[in-house]
Amino acid sequence: AVTADLTALGGKKDFKLDPALMEGSIAVKEGIQAGTYELPVTVKDQYENEYTGKVSVEVTERNKGTDFDWDEAVIYFAVTDRFYDGNTTNNDAYGTGDYNKDPATGSLSYHGGDFAGLTQKLDYLSDLGVNTIWITPIVANEMKKGLATDLPGTLSYGYHGYWASDFTTLNKHLGTEEEFKTLLDSAHKKGMKVMVDVVLNHAGYDTENYFNSMLNGKNMIRSGADLIEGDTKKGPLSNLPDFMTEDPDVRNLLVEWQSAWVSKYDIDYYRVDTVKHVDDTTWAAFKNALTRIDPDFKMI
C-alpha cells in the first residue's frame, strides 16, 4: 500500500495511491498559500514493513476572475441529436438512411440535432439561467438491428452516442470539427461551459473485430472466461461489447482516446458514463491524464 499525507494541503492524512499507477491527482483546499510543500509518503510491503519518503508539490495561485466553480453550475442536459437541427446537410451524414423524424417510424433514428443547433440556441439557454451545457457523447456510433424492444427487422441507431464505433472521430451526424469548436468558443464567450459525456466501459454493438484489432493480437473486448454474467465490472451491459479495462494496455488506449479530445478542444468537463462497471484503477488513470492536460479539468 502507498499513502501520502496531504494535511498540509488541507487534504487527507492517508491519501491512497494506486500501486498499479504510482501517481495520483490531488486537490488543494481553498485558502492554502501558494508555494512548495513537502508531503510525507509511506509505502507498506506485504509483510507490513514501512518505508517513508517525501515528495515535493508546487502550489500555484489560481486567478478565478469571472469564472464560476463547479458547485455553482446550473446544468442543462441535451441529447444533441434531439435538441435542434442547425445544419440539415448532415442529417444523412453517412448515406445510410438513418435520419427519420416520423413519430410513427423514426423513434430510433437520427432526428437532425447537431452542434450547429446548440450554438444557435445558446442565447435561449443563457436566458434560462444555464451556465453549463451537458451533451451526449460526440464520437462516431454504431447501429444495431432488431433490439428486443423493437419491431422485428427495425434498425436502432446510436443517435444517443453510447454505442461508440470509433473513439477518435466525431459523429458526422452531429457536425464537423469546426462546428464543434464553434460551439465551445461561442459558449465560452457567453460565460458558459460545456460538459461532454464519455464512455470507457463498452463499445457499440458488432464492433468486436474492430476493437480487437487495435493491440497487435491482444483483445480489447471481454469474451470467454473473462466475461462473467452478473458481475458488475466483468459482465456485459445490455449485451454491449465490454472493454477489459483492468488490462493496462486496454486501459491506456481508452484513456489516450478520450483524453485526446481535451487536448484538441477546450472542453470544460467530462460526465463519465457507467462508472460502477469500470475498475477504480482506470478511473484514477483517466483523472491523472486529464489533470496533466488541464489541472482545472473536472469530471463527474
What are these regions (language model features)?
Residues D69-A73, D81-Y265, W283-K298:
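Substrate-binding/active-site clefts of carbohydrate-active enzymes
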